[in-house]
């Protein structure tokens, strides 16, 4: 469950390490974002010579949350951290690698690239 001001780890090799959510997209007064939701973020910590710089405002998709996601069979998948993957204007990942597991809930038309790059799909 991500809201405005939430800090997230970055799960790709775009050059950003930590980002902060500045807006949850999808609805005029939407408060929370879960796994698979798109948010606006600002880069708070980045590595030198990366594709993105500190202070850049980007779009991101949430791939892991501490809150987790409930499956139809009743099982709950949750993680130790909140993490996101940075996206460009075409909703394609900025990085070329994804670190850590992602969930099957991302398996939609627009996020198949993230699923194919991920080392593990839960």
UniProtKB/Swiss-Prot annotation:
Gene3D superfamilies named among the record's database cross-references: Ribosomal protein L14
Any one GO cellular component localisation term in the record: cytosolic large ribosomal subunit
One of the record's GO molecular function terms: large ribosomal subunit rRNA binding
Keywords: Ribonucleoprotein, Ribosomal protein, RNA-binding, rRNA-binding
SUPFAM superfamilies assigned to the protein according to its UniProt record, in alphabetical order: Ribosomal protein L14
Statement: the UniProt record of this protein carries the keyword RNA-binding: yes
GO term, biological process aspect, one: translation
CDD domains: Ribosomal_uL14
Keyword Nucleus belongs to the record: no
Sequence similarity: Belongs to the universal ribosomal protein uL14 family.
Subunit architecture: Part of the 50S ribosomal subunit. Forms a cluster with proteins L3 and L19. In the 70S ribosome, L14 and L19 interact and together make contacts with the 16S rRNA in bridges B5 and B8.
Protein purpose: Binds to 23S rRNA. Forms part of two intersubunit bridges in the 70S ribosome.
Name by which UniProt lists this protein: Large ribosomal subunit protein uL14
Organism field: Alcanivorax borkumensis (strain ATCC 700651 / DSM 11573 / NCIMB 13689 / SK2)
